């Protein structure tokens, strides 16, 4: 439909359908550009459309990690895992956030869950080696004090 037709009333209700933005892809693009705050906004909008999508929750947790908001990251990793306990990326991310907080026993659980179902792909070996090294380190640390 041309600009002139729209301007002079040639458009009908059927021809002017609002288009839904793809907030998830927008968030991923913003994150690739390094705009993590913008990505978080778009992720929240995507979550509003799909509140039970564990991958969106995991992506939000990753963005929070990249902005240094570790407590929020932990909260979103936990929410993602409550919806999908097999989400290995969430186990990986949560394990390292917990390790940094000194919650070693729970970090070990999540590292083991990650390593039980390691991801496949070009970069996967790097993440698996990192998780294995962290697990070895945590298993040699003295148990947490109650």
PLM features: residue spans?
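Alpha-helical segment of the N-proximal tetratricopeptide repeat
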Residues: 16-52
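Conserved structural position within tetratricopeptide repeats
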Residues: 45-48, 78-82, 116
């Amino acid at each position: 439909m041309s600009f002139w037709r729209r301007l002079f009333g040639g458009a009908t209700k059927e021809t002017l359908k609002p288009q839904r933005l793809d907030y998830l892809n927008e968030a991923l693009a913003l994150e690739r550009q390094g705009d993590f705050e913008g990505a978080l906004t778009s992720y929240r909008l995507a979550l509003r459309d799909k509140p039970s999508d564990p991958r969106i929750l995991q992506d939000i947790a990753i963005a929070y990690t990249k902005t240094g908001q570790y407590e929020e990251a932990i909260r979103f990793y936990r929410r993602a895992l409550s919806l999908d306990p097999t989400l290995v990326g969430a186990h990986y991310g949560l394990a390292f956030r917990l390790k940094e907080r000194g919650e070693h026993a729970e970090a070990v659980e999540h590292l083991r869950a990650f390593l039980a179902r390691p991801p496949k792909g070009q970069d996967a070996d790097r993440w698996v080696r990192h998780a294995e090294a962290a697990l070895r380190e945590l298993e040699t640390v003295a148990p947490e004090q109650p």
